[in-house]
Each structure stands twice: as structure tokens, then as C-alpha cells.
Amino acid sequence: MINFACISPHAPILLPDVGSKEDRETVKKTIEGLYFLGEKFKELKPDSIIISSPHPDWGFNVPLYFLARDFKGEIKTFLIGNETPEFYFNQGKEFYTKYDIQNTKYNVALIASGDLSHCLKEEGPYGFHPDGPKFDKELIECLKKKDIENILKLDNIYPEAGECGLRSFCFLLGILETSKINYQTEILSYEGPFGVGYLVANFKLS
């Protein structure tokens, strides 16, 4: 059964061996949110992890550093490509059925790795675009409301947002939707001081 699910940013700057002390202080809320998730992960003791990411290296490594650094169980990685959000939502549904997650006797953790808009500030990696902050705000509101229908449309509504997490999040949401587990989205932190939106969210499962 699924007993843990979350959204995690994956910026290497969050890591103590990469980010400077000053940079990490600037994203203190994000780091605190990730450590909170790490404590939750330890408390719930999942036996295996399913983690999705648009990047094959830091996309997996950064969330796992904070959440499951000493984890010894099985880790299944799912690499996200450029297909539509709806495609990955359906992939999540198929993944749930293919691996018979419903009937497993083990506890499973879901981690959706991804960053929000990279266009929040002129000095950010892709400059500023008004789609950026609008996308981030609406995505967070939709997650709170469990409004999957509109989440799947955000890519078309804000095509210049420059995000890299939406499809990863949709994969996780597809799994949750198929599981029929009731959940509430708890936003632990959101900030974008470097022009990239970092969201940390916990799905409270019941």
C-alpha cells in the first residue's frame, strides 16, 4: 500500500556540498520543508520508493538525499520526458496497475521530483515571463483543491512558464487517483529567490 507521497524540488544548490552557506540560508524554508519530509519518511518506514523526475541524476539524488539518505529498500525510478501532462497522468495509472501496488504487502513511498517555473525573475536562468508566477500560483491552488482537471491544462494555459515538474507531479497524481486513497495536499513551503520556483508538499493520506 502507499503510505507516503510528496513533491520535492531538485536544485543541487540545496545540497550542503554544492550550495554556499549564503545560498542555502536564502532557501531555508525549502530545506526545512525537505527535512520535515525526511522525518515523516522515517516515521512511516516505507519498504520501497517510486520516484519520478525529468532529470536522471540530480533529479533523483537531491530528493533522496533529504528524504531517504540511508534507505536500504528498493527504489524504482521513472524518468519523465516531453509528452503531455495527461500522458504522464495516465502513465501513473498504468504504473499502479502494472506493479499491483494495491495488493502489495509492502509500504510504498511516492516522490515526485521537479521544480516549478524558471521564469520568475529577470536575473533567473531564463529571465522573467508573466506565465511563470501565474503558473506557480495556479498549480499550488489546484493541488490544494485536488483539481486534477485543471492541473492537466496548465501546460497549455501557461506555455512559457518554463517549468520542469508538472509532468512528474501528474505521474504521482495518476498513481494516487487510481489507488482511490483519500488525500489532502499540505504545502510545506514555496519560494523562488533565484528565479526558480521550489515547492515542497506533503500528501496527507488517509
Where are the model-predicted features located?
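Membrane-interface soluble catalytic domains
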Residues: 191-206
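Glycine-rich phosphate- or other oxyanion-binding loops that anchor nucleotides, phosphorylated ligands
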Residues: 59-103
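Flexible, glycine/proline-enriched loop segments at strand-loop-helix junctions
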Residues: 24-25, 78-88, 126, 158-159
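Polyanion-binding loop/helix "lid" in catalytic or ligand-binding cores
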Residues: 32-33, 145-190
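Gly/Ser/Thr-rich active-site loops/lids in small-molecule metabolic enzymes
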Residues: 127-150
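Active-site beta-strand/loop microenvironment that shapes enzyme catalytic pockets
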Residues: 87-135
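A short aromatic-anchored loop/beta-hairpin motif
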Residues: 1-60, 65, 76
